[in-house]
Amino acid sequence: MALFGAHVSSAGSILKTFKRAKDIGAEVFQFFLRSPRAWYWKGVDKETKQAFIEKLKDFKNPVMVHAPYLLNLASPNEELREKSVKVFLEELKFCDEVGIHFYNFHPGTAKGISDEEGLRNVIKSLEEVFSEYTPKFTTVLLENTAGERGDLGKNFKELKEIMNVFRGIKLGVCLDTCHAFAYGYEINTKEGFENFKREIEKMVGLESVKAVHANDSKVPLGGRKDRHEHIGKGYIGLEGFKNLLKDEYFSTLPYYIETPKENNMDPVNLSVLREIYQNNDL
């Protein structure tokens, strides 16, 4: 059964995320542990941590933490790469300790180096992470990217290269619909969607996809820019989300919207997804 939710703010306290999710009718939710554009994190005090654990147990459905945007595990700058590994480790440990289901990250950006070198750096960084800490509960999700500015993980061949190194580690994929479409996957036609599924199955296996970031795209197919739009209002359109939500496998996953936040649109976007999912006439 598909579950629908959104990215919510953790401003003030991570405990506030549950109420913010409830207020928009979210069955699942995602949040940042720290400002996505800051390295510093004051951490979580013992009382807040315990309260969060209890709330999470009551919530039951999958909660996702998104890694900060500053992280770049692919960076040729050793100081930046090591800093990224440190933050990744810090957040992954916390997620695993409190029972967060998913820790999601962008593989990284190959700035000034080849994609191959960048992928080697990502693998090196993850080796450093997992040699120090192996999650027992939390699944680490690699998010596909739009391929903008050297972003890695833009296709499932690249994701496979990373994931194949870490057999036995709780790894999976978070499919971002906007990123996939902007890269060039034609998920809004029947034929394009079937080709897309075949590539996933061939490269990483459908079962590797554990969650979906449901976002329409402000850029056309292959536009290679990460620009999210409201569901049904962009170039993917309702057909793309219908392909996903009527599919035997993708209709079983949790969906997290990261659509523009203006005018309290989260409940509207969630209702559009639910209507597609529940209406057999569509």
Swiss-Prot record:
Q: Which SUPFAM superfamilies match?
A: Xylose isomerase-like (SSF51658)
Q: Which residues bind Zn(2+) 3?
A: H179, D226, H228
Q: According to the UniProt record, which cysteines are disulfide-bonded?
A: none
GO MF terms held by the record: deoxyribonuclease IV (phage-T4-induced) activity; DNA binding; DNA-(apurinic or apyrimidinic site) endonuclease activity; phosphoric diester hydrolase activity; zinc ion binding
Which reaction(s) does the protein catalyse, per the Swiss-Prot or TrEMBL entry? Endonucleolytic cleavage to 5'-phosphooligonucleotide end-products
Fetch the InterPro entries from UniProt: AP_endonuc_2 (IPR001719), AP_endonuc_F2_Zn_BS (IPR018246), Xyl_isomerase-like_sf (IPR036237), Xyl_isomerase-like_TIM-brl (IPR013022)
Q: Which Pfam families match?
A: AP_endonuc_2 (PF01261)
Q: Give the co-factor note.
A: Binds 3 Zn(2+) ions.
What are the entry keywords? Answer: DNA damage, DNA repair, Endonuclease, Hydrolase, Metal-binding, Nuclease, Zinc
Enzyme Commission identifier(s): 3.1.21.2
What functional role does this protein have?
A: Endonuclease IV plays a role in DNA repair. It cleaves phosphodiester bonds at apurinic or apyrimidinic (AP) sites, generating a 3'-hydroxyl group and a 5'-terminal sugar phosphate.
NCBIfam families, alphabetically?
nfo (TIGR00587)
Please state which protein family the record places this protein in: Belongs to the AP endonuclease 2 family.
Q: What is this protein called?
A: Probable endonuclease 4
Q: Which organism is it from?
A: Aquifex aeolicus (strain VF5)
Q: Which gene encodes it?
A: nfo
